[in-house]
A protein has these predicted regions:
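Short acidic/glycine- and proline-prone juxtamembrane loop motifs at membrane-interface regions
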Residues: 59-66
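Transmembrane catalytic cores of multi-pass membrane glycosyltransferases
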Residues: 97-217, 227-243
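Transmembrane-helix motifs of polytopic, lipid-linked glycan transferases
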Residues: 17-37
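Signature aromatic-anchored transmembrane alpha helix within multi-pass, membrane-resident enzymes
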Residues: 196, 253, 257-283
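Short periplasmic/luminal acceptor-recognition loop of GT-C membrane glycosyltransferases, typified by
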Residues: 291-294, 301-336
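Transmembrane-helix signature of polytopic, membrane-embedded enzymes
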Residues: 30-52
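Specific aromatic-rich, kink-prone transmembrane helix
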Residues: 29, 51-54, 66-83, 93
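Short hydrophobic alpha-helices at membrane interfaces in multi-pass membrane enzymes
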Residues: 80-99, 129-132
Length: 336
């Protein structure tokens, strides 16, 4: 995208547009998926929306976040075509769709595979198929998503190394979960994640709420993947941590309210979701405003640099870990 759009609007506006689009696509994916499985926007969907600004996004994993946003949108389409028995059209569409998502980032493609398998296995079980038959049929239905496997097999056949390190680091995985909404204010960010986890926990014990089978199974598969995935995979660090916020998101989207439930509970969840979404949006906006001021102050030095001058930049990060992600590391690249 960065290579295609710059001649039209310039490099910096292009990057800004892409990053803004990632947030919009993620929220659209959450809402469309909720609508497809529940027949309307779920009462807890608004709790999931702030995950568009999750820790992986704040960290700068824009390719990853783009692929996950596209995966959620594609999953909603997969369910829609399955419900309307247009499996032939789905076969044709998802060969290029899966390739494009894989091209954005392998993790989004992998997540889509888990999502699609969860949907198909649930559908096969509902149709009365035994587990073994249901698993086989579900795998066959997901074959349109398998084309990137051939590319990866041939591209990595020469090296033969997946470069996977740091397995089953439970303390770190716990940290990734509680920092899923990490931004600027540690107490507020951890409290926000705690609220989301409590909502999922309450759903398990409250009789008036239940999980949608497709999304519950999708969340389970994604959660198991997060637990067994190493921290470093294919030479890329934080492979597991990036999944944590999306496991929570799918868990929230899976919650549905029984039709005969107390109206006050439904209204309470919707109101609470809107309040949570508003609070996180206000906090994120203020945090980004402060980052914008800081970055512009740093960029002011570029005007004093002569064209063609040799430039060295030092960023002091300190020895004590801080909650906020470092935003200054890439600022010197503006001098190029």
């Amino acid at each position: 995208l960065v290579q295609v759009i710059p001649p039209l609007i310039g490099l910096e506006p292009d990057v800004k547009l892409i990053v803004i689009a990632i947030v919009a696509l993620t929220t659209a994916g959450f809402l469309l998926l909720s609508y497809e499985v529940h027949g309307r926007i779920g009462a807890t969907a608004f709790f999931a929306l702030p995950i568009a600004y999750s820790a992986p996004f704040q960290f700068g994993f824009v390719n990853y976040c783009l692929s996950m946003a596209l995966a959620f949108l594609a999953f909603a389409l997969w369910i829609r075509l399955g419900k309307t028995d247009r499996t032939g059209l789905r076969l044709l569409l998802f060969v290029p769709i899966s390739f494009l998502i894989w091209l954005a980032h392998i993790s989004g493609w992998g997540a889509l595979g888990l999502f699609a398998f969860a949907a198909e296995l649930t559908r096969m079980r509902d149709a009365g198929n035994r587990w073994f038959i249901a698993i086989i049929k579900s795998g066959l239905h997901c074959m349109p998503l398998a084309i990137p496997i051939l590319i990866m097999v041939f591209s990595r056949s020469s090296s033969g190394d997946i470069n996977a390190e740091d397995w089953f680091n439970w303390a770190t995985k716990y940290e990734w979960v509680i920092t899923s909404l990490r931004d600027r204010w540690q107490g507020f960010d951890i409290a926000s994640v705690t609220v989301l986890l409590l909502i999922i926990a309450v759903e398990i014990v409250l009789a008036d709420l239940r999980f949608n089978a497709i999304l519950a199974f999708a969340a389970l598969l994604l959660g198991v993947t997060f637990l067994i995935m190493p921290r470093i995979l294919f030479g890329s660090a934080y492979a597991d941590m990036r999944l944590a916020p999306y496991v929570i998101a799918v868990g929230l989207l899976a919650i549905e309210i029984k039709s005969d439930v107390n109206l006050w509970l439904r209204r309470g969840l919707i109101s609470g979701g809107l309040l949570f979404f508003s609070a996180r949006t206000i906090a994120t906006t203020e945090s980004f405003r402060r980052f914008d001021i800081m970055i512009n102050n740093e960029l002011a030095a570029i005007n004093s640099i002569a064209k063609g001058a040799r430039v060295a930049a030092l960023i002091s990060r300190g020895c004590v870990p801080i909650w906020m992600f470092e935003r200054r590391s890439h600022i010197p690249s503006f001098a190029l």
